[in-house]
Amino acid sequence: MGKIRIQEVILEDNAKRYMLIDRNGFPVLPVMKYLKYLDQTGKSPNTQKTYGYSLKRFYTYLEEKGKDYKFIRLEDLIDFVGWLRSPYQSSNVTPLQQERAKRTEKTINLTITVIANFYDYLYRNEEVQNDMMEKLMKQVFTGGHSRYKSFLHHVNKNKPSIRNILKLKEPRKK
């Protein structure tokens, strides 16, 4: 048995596509369908590759935890964020002193977005029962009492915006 991996596939026209291969050497069908959907809807090969690697991390996590992708709860995604932040390959390791996260907040946010979109695709195709997007997103009213008002504040002040509850705060660029 090997590792879960991304396999690059070269098509007849030299275009690159990607497949997620499980430990037994077989393609992971739901991910294959999703990556094909991304291709059919015109997403670039780089986007497909990035999504493939994000899904590889997620399936590695699922395998480590012994979970089935069809029965994921919000609690599992919260644990997945912690797993992504861990500087160790295993979630069974507890550090004695604080260490830097293995991935940046931006990378983790991208991965969570990929997973949310993947589950939205599965839900719309009736492959999973739970609408994960409904659980991940919440409405937030942005018309607070701050002094700063955006140019279109008067248009949007009573409309809620939708935010992902798992999104990490990213440090500002210097």
Predicted regions and their residues:
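Basic/aromatic DNA-contact patch characteristic of tyrosine site-specific recombinases
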Residues: 1-43, 49-56
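Intrinsically disordered, low-complexity regions
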Residues: 3, 26, 144-145, 173
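Residue-level marker of intrinsically disordered, low-complexity segments enriched
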Residues: 2-8, 18-19, 70, 126, ...
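N-terminal core-binding DNA-recognition domain of tyrosine recombinases/integrases
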Residues: 31-46, 56-150
